[in-house]
């Protein structure tokens, strides 16, 4: 929960007794309250590196995991968590290079002392955590440089023994399963990434680099719903960045596709289909951001701006925890309302609710399809 006064300044010093949490109008008992104090990204100047860059090209990138929190561990306290997620299956090589260059620029020029950055990649049917949350610029830049050059090209050994094991990669569905169940692989991978980050109680921003994301029919609505719900439950906001940037499209498509032919070339139907397809590829990015509290960066060439926007949005906030008094597994949306128990005049920004679990008897056909798909993973 972000609590600010009328001037936009964070209000500090509040406790659980100062908040009122209601779920569908029913008051809930707050069991946990913690304040995360972060300097505003606008006022926190980027930290200049104290030593020259020492960038290495690894022969093999390590596959690791997001380190879970342990009792008494204050590693993530008062830190801003940014996960850079590169969907290599959704970007052609030129877009991949633009996305990686934007990440390099952010790390070199915009990263502050409060930032911890993680690097994730989706490729080959698995979500790989290439680097856990860290503030070490050289390690971050080395991983990104290796992604640009390509694994197997460098001479430096990875510093992590896990680079030669497959324990760090979260299994994803293969092509045959996706063809059978008509499931969008990018959304399923995003759901996996959100659940990985859900081990941490702090607010997380997942910056999602992709060249659009287009649904393949009504069946994928169930997967979209599941991905958004997983992000909300995990405290993750999606910040999609369209790696294509500002695109000037040829009316009938570029040279990568054959001429459409037929009367559509002359009536404008073919040109309309190209434009509609491009817009639909951005609609899902917009929905992912809007439903999780993030913002999509579309039609903009400076991709670094999308990361900076995710960074600047996260300021000081409170973490509230409670056990719901509603045990019904009906799959319905439960609206949350948070207010202050005192006479303070403040603006509160928080997640508006979540979807409850659902019993099998209430599953739709799409839900049953997703459950069968999960069982085959």
Describe the function of each predicted region.
Residues 1-377:
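Scaffold/interface architecture of coatomer-like assemblies
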